[in-house]
Amino acid sequence: MAESATDSGNVAEQYSLLPKLMPNLDRHLIYPLLNFSADEDAEQPLDQKKLLLELLKPTNMTDFVGQLYQDVHNLDDMPDEYKTKRDQVLQRRDKLEEETSKISGLLDDENVVTNLRSDKVQNLAYLKDTHGVTVEMVNQLYEFGSFQYSCGVYPHAAELLYRFRVLVRNIQEREATWGKLACEFLSVNWDSAIEEINKLKETIDTRLFNNPLAQLQHRTWLIHWSLFPLFNHEPARESLTDMFFSPSYINTIQTNCPWILRYLAAAVITNRNKGRNSNQYQKQLKDLIRIVRQEGYEYSDPVTDFIKALYIDFDFEEAQKKLSETEEILKNDFFLLGAADQFVDAARHLISESYCKIHQRIDIKDLSTRLGLSQDEGEKWIVNLIRDTRVDAKIDYKAGTVIMNHPPQSVYQQVIERTKGGFFRTQVLSAAVAK
């Protein structure tokens, strides 16, 4: 269980998730995380360059790796070994280009493409019988795609892997889909990336059905990889959040990667403005609270602690403290930096709404302090809140208070509300006993 931060200056470092995320990502996807700095103008530290050098050494990005080596060791020129490797990479590229030229030319031919169908076996048979294409030629597409990926030529790699996938249906097809997904991320093609995520999700559900361990591992990878579009592509946030909350994926998070709760909490909170009154949003918020409560012994950080303080402990002072720590964490997290301001704004609304629900007379100065705002800022905030949420409330500017008009609930309604849950549980137990 994560300990509470004692020094707000190092809270982001203390709760860094890099060691948890990296084992579940490809090295090309790890690069932007290691290269990330909240301060874009800051000079890259030597230790960071050393990490990047070790990360990218196995790739074919020879010029970039050679430059990193030169910087790390303070050399005037790139070492000869990198120049030699660059020549070897270029020779290998030319060879693969030549070996795949025939099949690439065929797949560029509109007359050939119009004869291809959804049946991959039939496609390969057609190309083999009509144009003399061999299985080896098809495999060379995969080899060339993997090579280009290693070189960092992501758009071309994506095209080669896509063409390979049109013609095969085996384990390599799944590997090609993972590779194409990474290419789409690194080329910032979010719509195509979402298509690949959906393909992988279906593949994991259907083709790994008889191998639960492999299914769990692949779902874990897909959850981590999906963090890239989750906060970088607004249209995808809702569908990916739905995926994370689906039974198989929420079970994977609880079993294999509870630290993903940070990102799930951020996604739910930042979705507040879109659907705070929708049944789906309210259900997700309730599910999030339940899971944070269940997993508190296994994982916690200021983001999940904020949820706990606000919705489980109803401790508004603690919620404000955790929100302050959360803001720092978000601004130092590669995935969450762009959502930091949106999260803080939505979180303040949630604090205000919860506070107003349980108090009839609210001191503006006190609520402003709980929101981390000055009294003037707090007053404006409350005015906007009353207007936006259309709650029945009046501001007494002279007394510096807000008077909430909570409609009285009849005794009968209170009894109904309190017994409704018990009645439902009794029905479930009765049904279980009857079986």
From Swiss-Prot:
It is found in: Cytoplasm. GO terms for molecular function: translation initiation factor activity. One of its GO terms (cellular component) is nucleus. InterPro entries: eIF3e, eIF3e_N, PCI_dom, WH_DNA-bd_sf. GO terms for biological process: formation of cytoplasmic translation initiation complex; translational initiation. It holds the Pfam family eIF3_N. Keywords: Cytoplasm, Initiation factor, Protein biosynthesis. Residues 241-409 form the PCI domain. The keyword rRNA processing does not apply. It comes from the Eukaryota. Component of the eukaryotic translation initiation factor 3 (eIF-3) complex. PANTHER family: EUKARYOTIC TRANSLATION INITIATION FACTOR 3 SUBUNIT E (PTHR10317). Component of the eukaryotic translation initiation factor 3 (eIF-3) complex, which is involved in protein synthesis of a specialized repertoire of mRNAs and, together with other initiation factors, stimulates binding of mRNA and methionyl-tRNAi to the 40S ribosome. The eIF-3 complex specifically targets and initiates translation of a subset of mRNAs involved in cell proliferation. Belongs to the eIF-3 subunit E family. This is Eukaryotic translation initiation factor 3 subunit E. It comes from Phaeosphaeria nodorum (strain SN15 / ATCC MYA-4574 / FGSC 10173) (Glume blotch fungus). The lineage of its organism: Eukaryota, Fungi, Dikarya, Ascomycota, Pezizomycotina.
